[in-house]
UniProtKB/Swiss-Prot annotation:
It comes from the Bacteria. Belongs to the UPF0301 (AlgH) family. GO terms for cellular component: cytosol. InterPro entries: AlgH-like. This is UPF0301 protein Sfri_2850.
Length: 186
C-alpha cells in the first residue's frame, strides 16, 4: 500500500459506539513500521487560550480577541503529549514537514508563539495521538473500518471540528450511509 501520509482517515459508520466514532484522522506518518495520526474533529472542551494559561503561556492583549480555537483529542495514545498541526514555518525546535501545506510540531515553543505575531497562520492543537503498528492500519482499511481521502488545508484548518466528518464524507462522492461495512467475496 502506498503511504497515507497527508491523507485523512474517515471512520466508517460501523465504528459507532467506539472511541473513533465519526472520527477524521490526519495521517502524519505512515511507513513500513506503522502509522501515526491525529484525530482532528474531537474537541476536548478546552479552548487553546485556556490551555496556554494552564501552561503559563499568556497571550498578548491584542491577540486575545482573535484566538477562537479548541483543543482536540488527537487520540488515545500519550494523552498528556501535545501536538500542533500548522501551516509551514521553520523556526520551531521539534518540527516535521508533512506536506508543502502542513507541518507537525511537538515542542513548547510553538505554543508560546500562538496569539502573537510569530504564530503560524493556521494551526490545530491536539493532545494525544492515534497509532498503528506494522500492517495494522492496512488491515483495518481492508476490514472496511476506514475510508481515505487526500488531505486538504481547507478541510484541516477551516472546517469546524463538529462538521468535519460530514464534510469529509461528502468529498468521497457517495452517500456513506449507503455503504455496507461487510466485506464480500464474489
Amino acid at each position: 500500500m502506498d503511504s497515507l501520509k497527508d491523507h485523512f482517515l474517515i471512520a466508517m459508520p460501523s465504528l459507532d459506539d467506539t472511541f473513533f466514532e465519526r472520527s477524521v484522522i490526519y495521517i502524519c506518518e505512515h511507513d513500513q513500521k506503522g502509522a501515526m495520526g491525529l484525530m482532528v474533529n474531537r474537541p476536548i472542551g478546552v479552548e487553546v487560550e485556556d490551555l496556554l494559561e494552564q501552561m503559563e503561556l499568556y497571550l498578548s492583549p491584542e491577540f486575545v480577541f482573535s484566538l477562537d480555537s479548541q483543543v482536540l483529542i488527537g487520540g488515545p495514545v500519550a494523552p498528556e503529549r501535545g501536538f500542533v498541526l500548522h501551516t509551514p514555518q521553520q523556526h520551531w525546535v521539534n518540527s516535521t514537514e508533512i506536506s508543502e501545506d502542513t507541518m507537525l510540531t511537538s515542542s513548547r515553543d510553538i505554543l508560546a508563539s500562538i496569539g502573537s505575531d510569530k504564530s503560524p497562520e493556521n494551526f490545530v492543537v491536539a493532545l494525544g495521538y492515534s497509532g498503528w503498528s506494522k500492517d495494522q492500519l492496512e488491515q483495518e482499511i481492508a476490514d472496511n473500518t476506514w475510508l481515505t481521502i487526500k488531505a486538504t488545508p481547507e478541510l484541516l484548518f477551516n472546517v469546524e471540528p463538529e462538521q468535519m466528518w460530514l464534510m469529509a464524507t461528502q468529498q468521497l462522492g457517495f452517500d456513506i450511509w449507503q455503504m455496507s461495512s461487510q466485506v464480500g467475496h464474489a
